[in-house]
Amino acid sequence: MDVLPMCSIFQELQIVHETGYFSALPSLEEYWQQTCLELERYLQSEPCYVSASEIKFDSQEDLWTKFILAREKKEESELKISSSPPEDSLISSSFNYNLETNSLNSDVSSESSDSSEELSPTTKFTSDPIGEVLVNSGNLSSSVISTPPSSPEVNRESSQLWGCGPGDLPSPGKVRSGTSGKSGDKGNGDASPDGRRRVHRCHFNGCRKVYTKSSHLKAHQRTHTGEKPYRCSWEGCEWRFARSDELTRHFRKHTGAKPFKCSHCDRCFSRSDHLALHMKRHL
């Protein structure tokens, strides 16, 4: 297989040398390469987002029992806090505050994971007993509760939040200004494979594709509609494409640009997959 792209490059050079230009008509080999790339792209598996409605619990009675036990434990802890010495009460109250701050960080991180969506007007400051029971029971899948990857800047901000006292709880505006646009706070849930929530779902019948960006979803939906809005501007060329990167790759056939250079030799290529095939010769 790695001989075919090399033959195609030599043929292109020979045509340009003899005629002075390169024909826009694709060859059978180019059709074959394009088909292989499309098959590799559309047949690869992607992680699917599991909605909360698809999660099945053991029984409603067990869930209700866990909720009652969580409430009783919370009331007992509050009684212990009220009857304990000042030092113990300070430690336990700071522990409860850390739990509440942790739930707050998870809520804020889930809101700021997608920069294209607006933030909700309210923020949840108190820990939810039902949410704690569901998380501790282990019935939720890791794809439902997902948080963005951590960054050094946000870790410093989260340490500042954890360092303040129970009475110095920051306002919603301060929390949003410090965390909006940064995907970094760690929540209680497990992180998804790419670190962000997949919120853009394809609504065509039988399609279960989910994307993190709306632009990627629009490009995917063109495979269902057959729309090709990107047209080649080269004179005499009528080719159209559904994605802008495909148009850019096609336009290099007219200009002869080869931006992909081999790091082991002086060979240059117009496509990254051709360079990858060539790099196998140096292994």
From Swiss-Prot:
User: Which residue stretches does the UniProt record annotate as biased composition, category Low complexity?
Assistant: 104-113, 133-148
A GO CC term assigned to this protein in UniProt = cytoplasm
Keywords in alphabetical order, please: Activator, DNA-binding, Metal-binding, Nucleus, Repeat, Transcription, Transcription regulation, Zinc, Zinc-finger
Q: What is its main location?
A: nucleus
SMART domains linked: ZnF_C2H2
Task: Determine the domain of life of the protein's source.
Answer: Eukaryota
An MF annotation (GO) of this entry: DNA binding
Instruction: Cite the record's Basic and acidic residues compositional bias ranges.
Output: 183-196
- Report the SUPFAM superfamilies cross-referenced here: beta-beta-alpha zinc fingers
ZnF C2H2-type span: 200-224, 230-254, 260-282
Renumbered ranges of motif 9aaTAD: 62-70
Q: Where, by tissue, is this protein expressed?
A: Highly expressed in placenta.
Region: Disordered; residue ranges are 104-198
Q: Which family does it belong to?
A: Belongs to the krueppel C2H2-type zinc-finger protein family.
The domain-related comment in the record is: The acidic N-terminal part may favor interaction with the basic domain of transcription factors.
Subunit: Interacts with ZZEF1.
The protein's role, per its UniProt record: Transcriptional activator. Binds a GC box motif. Could play a role in B-cell growth and development.
Q: Mind telling me what this protein is named?
A: Krueppel-like factor 6
Q: Which organism is it from?
A: Mus musculus (Mouse)
